Amino acid sequence: AKRAEEQMKKVKGIEKWIEGYKHVKTLVDELALAFDFYKEEMVTEEEVDEAYAKCIEAIEELELRNMLRQEEDQMSCVLKINSGAGGTESQDWASMLMRMYMRYAESHGYKCNISHLQDGDEAGIKTVTMEIEGDSAYGYLKSENGVHRLVRVSPYNAQGKRMTSFASVFVTPL
């Protein structure tokens, strides 16, 4: 039964590629037809441009799917943010990153659940762990791994100096 499930998963994956190819082929054929009609002055240049834009969009969508081919890319993920050195400034930056990733998840139809949150001393957060559930959440967010830096005039510094804040982000498949 388990082997059958694995085979069906592979078949569905291949079917997605075939459907994507057929969709792009249809759009390319429509573009060629639109261009032929344009040469005969039966359609406007704007209509050809519109057909071209649809082709490019579909091809780029396939290219992105090709970049997310690893098995774990299809999974949900755990995203952890830690504020770096810099006290309140970095804690505020970590909080901004948290809100940004939550909005990103929401806008892509992912479910976001905060499993651990430690507030900062004055503002922001020291650390947060979020579970982001949805198709390919890990694939889209894995490139966020690393240290994120923000340089700005600090609202917490009375002298109005520019401050550099750091926060680290770790993304792992769920």
Question: What do these predicted regions represent?
Answer:
Residues 1-3:
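Short amphipathic helix-turn modules centered on a small-residue break
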Residues 6-174:
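A conserved glycine-rich
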